[in-house]
From Swiss-Prot:
This is SsrA-binding protein. The keyword RNA-binding applies. The gene is smpB. It comes from Acinetobacter baumannii (strain ATCC 17978 / DSM 105126 / CIP 53.77 / LMG 1025 / NCDC KC755 / 5377). It comes from the Bacteria. CDD domains: SmpB. GO terms for biological process: trans-translation. It is found in: Cytoplasm. PROSITE patterns: SSRP. NCBIfam families: PRK05422.1, smpB. Belongs to the SmpB family. Required for rescue of stalled ribosomes mediated by trans-translation. Binds to transfer-messenger RNA (tmRNA), required for stable association of tmRNA with ribosomes. tmRNA and SmpB together mimic tRNA shape, replacing the anticodon stem-loop with SmpB. tmRNA is encoded by the ssrA gene; the 2 termini fold to resemble tRNA(Ala) and it encodes a 'tag peptide', a short internal open reading frame. During trans-translation Ala-aminoacylated tmRNA acts like a tRNA, entering the A-site of stalled ribosomes, displacing the stalled mRNA.
Amino acid sequence: MAKATVVKKHNGGTIAQNKRARHDYFIEEKFEAGMSLLGWEVKSLRAGRMSLTESYVIFKNGEAFLFGAQIQPLLSASTHIVPEATRTRKLLLSRRELEKLMGAVNQKGYSCVPLACYWKGHLVKLEIALVKGKQLHDKRATEKERDWQRDKARIFHK
């Protein structure tokens, strides 16, 4: 009789979120991208040691790169190398998605930022979004709308 295989599950699936991006930008369209990582980075992601604040996506030579994201190294996982926490990481997107994103980012007012990093099976995926910046009055209107939705739910719940 065959031995039962133990499936290792990751807690939650979400590694990191960029809540600041949802506050500062209007999200036009979302994309899912793979990331090219080193071994010590994957071990650090399993421990949940990633920060997406102040990170963004840049395009060079027809390729997309994640710039400014921090993956803090584990002391036990990176003993033989000197890890760089904020290195630029290549994003894996299809040609059609790359062309669509590059065309939109070249327009005035659009940029591309990461929203979340999560596990999809044994792979690390990054949710990136095509965004447009918010003005201060837009942020206030969004906050007022969120408060009204919360109050409305509280009233109807009674």
